[in-house]
């Protein structure tokens, strides 16, 4: 029983989709300003403005 719980816990931890964030030095005031920056630098539109800097996700 204990082994099956540990196995289930290991499967859940391994299946979590870790998102890799990539920081930029581009200033922003809204997340929509980061979308073209992220597309140009990393090839994805997934990004948001955090602490007045663009942060892109792959």
Curated annotation (Swiss-Prot):
The record marks 48 as: Basic residue of the functional dyad. It holds the Pfam family Toxin_2. Residues 1-21 form the signal peptide. Its main location: secreted. One of its GO terms (cellular component) is extracellular region. PROSITE patterns: SCORP_SHORT_TOXIN. The record marks 57 as: Aromatic residue of the functional dyad. GO terms for molecular function: ion channel inhibitor activity; potassium channel regulator activity; toxin activity. Disulfide bonds join 28-49, 34-54, 38-56. InterPro entries: Scorpion_toxin-like_sf, Scorpion_toxinS_K_inh. Has the structural arrangement of an alpha-helix connected to a beta-sheet by disulfide bonds (CSalpha/beta). Potent blocker of both large-conductance calcium-activated potassium channels (KCa1.1/KCNMA1) and voltage-gated potassium channels (Kv1.3/KCNA3 and ERG1/Kv11.1/KCNH2). This is Potassium channel toxin alpha-KTx 1.6. The lineage of its organism: Eukaryota, Metazoa, Ecdysozoa, Arthropoda, Chelicerata.
């Amino acid at each position: 029983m204990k082994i099956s719980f540990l196995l289930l816990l290991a499967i859940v931890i391994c299946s979590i989709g870790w998102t890799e964030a990539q920081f930029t030095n581009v200033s922003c005031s809204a997340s929509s300003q980061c979308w073209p920056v992220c597309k140009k630098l990393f090839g994805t539109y997934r990004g948001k403005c955090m602490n007045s800097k663009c942060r892109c996700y792959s």
